[in-house]
């Protein structure tokens, strides 16, 4: 069953009289980062209208569930191959929890399992769950673990659009993401403007220098924009030494709660930026080693600052240099120019 047909008939997609208990069961895999799970949120939320959805992801999925897809179930599991280093130290893998997780999932008797990642490890995991239908993007022979393989979208396609293609195969309509050029304000603010500025990122190669973020804060404050400054734990002392009040959330739930009071987000190419976009906040994201066409936050009014050219881009955070030139060469003036346009559209 590797053809291009939809699974709508195979899994008996619901009509208007069906209840949650007799909806088909859908297993969604997104083992990787906060940003990846936030990008999947539109698909997950839409899928709950047609399926009993279970999401397998890292534990912060429990924080996202009530906020972004309240009708989905969560099974938290940390896939060892998502570690940045030592991912194939098999002697350190949680074999017992892997066995328990797969046993639990097999007991659910899923009608469909899906992954939007071009990853044979996901496909093997789906095969072990014994889901009746397994849908994904095959690679290196992993089509043997799938019942439906989907051709990869064009190289320049956004990561969000892989979820759109998965949705097409199982009868879940998730529109393709297309970034829009924002040239004028479309809605007025009903409260004083407040903007999140988040200076952290999952990896150091994605962290724009803090002294440059400080200049952004100074400009925002001069423009009468209230700033909620958020940083990662290791950055806190620097900000406090520069007399800035800073918030260091202890969980994804705390991060989301803090951002609820804001109308826009400014930060690095990071999970918090994708979370902000999923929450409906327009984003201005400063990129370095990653490709913006793949991973810009999927808010239609979002803006990006492109990192400098590098022959190794994208390096997937494995920078070959002592410092990431692609990010270091993004000047304060370059970001300020974008920030002023961003504020005019979204915070004035």
Regions found by a protein language model. Give the residues of each.
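Catalytic machinery of carbohydrate-active enzymes
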Residues: 1-348
């Amino acid at each position: 069953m590797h053809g291009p047909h939809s699974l709508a008939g195979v899994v008996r997609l619901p009509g208007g009289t069906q209840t949650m208990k007799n909806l088909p069961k859908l297993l969604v895999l997104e083992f990787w980062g906060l940003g990846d799970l936030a990008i999947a949120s539109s698909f997950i939320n839409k899928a709950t209208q047609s399926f009993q959805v279970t999401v397998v992801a890292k534990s912060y999925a429990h924080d996202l569930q009530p906020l972004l897809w309240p009708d989905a179930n969560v099974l938290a599991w940390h896939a060892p191959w998502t570690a940045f280093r030592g991912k194939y130290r098999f002697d350190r893998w949680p074999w017992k929890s892997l066995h328990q997780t797969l046993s639990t999932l097999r007991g659910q008797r899923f009608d469909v399992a899906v992954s939007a990642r071009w990853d044979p490890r996901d496909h093997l995991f789906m095969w072990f769950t014994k889901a009746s239908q397994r849908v994904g993007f095959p690679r290196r022979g992993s089509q043997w673990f799938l019942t439906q393989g989907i051709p990869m979208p064009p190289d320049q396609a956004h990561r969000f659009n892989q979820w759109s293609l998965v949705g097409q195969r199982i009868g879940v309509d998730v529109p393709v993401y297309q970034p829009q050029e924002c040239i004028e304000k479309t809605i007025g603010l009903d409260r004083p403007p407040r903007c999140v500025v988040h200076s952290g990122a999952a990896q150091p190669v994605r962290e724009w220098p803090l002294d440059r973020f400080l200049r952004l804060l100074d400009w925002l404050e001069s423009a009468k924009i209230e700033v909620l400054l958020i940083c990662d734990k290791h950055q806190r002392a620097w900000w406090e030494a520069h007399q800035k009040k800073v918030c260091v959330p202890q969980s994804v739930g705390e991060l989301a709660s803090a951002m609820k009071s804001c109308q826009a987000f400014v930060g690095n190419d990071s999970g918090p930026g994708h979370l902000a976009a999923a929450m409906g906040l327009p984003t201005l994201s400063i990129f370095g080693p990653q490709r913006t066409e793949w991973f810009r936050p999927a808010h239609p009014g979002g803006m990006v600052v492109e990192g400098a050219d590098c022959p190794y881009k994208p390096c997937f955070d494995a920078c070959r240099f002592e410092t990431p030139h692609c990010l270091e060469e993004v000047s304060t003036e370059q970001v300020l120019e974008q920030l002023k346009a961003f504020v005019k559209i979204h915070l004035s």
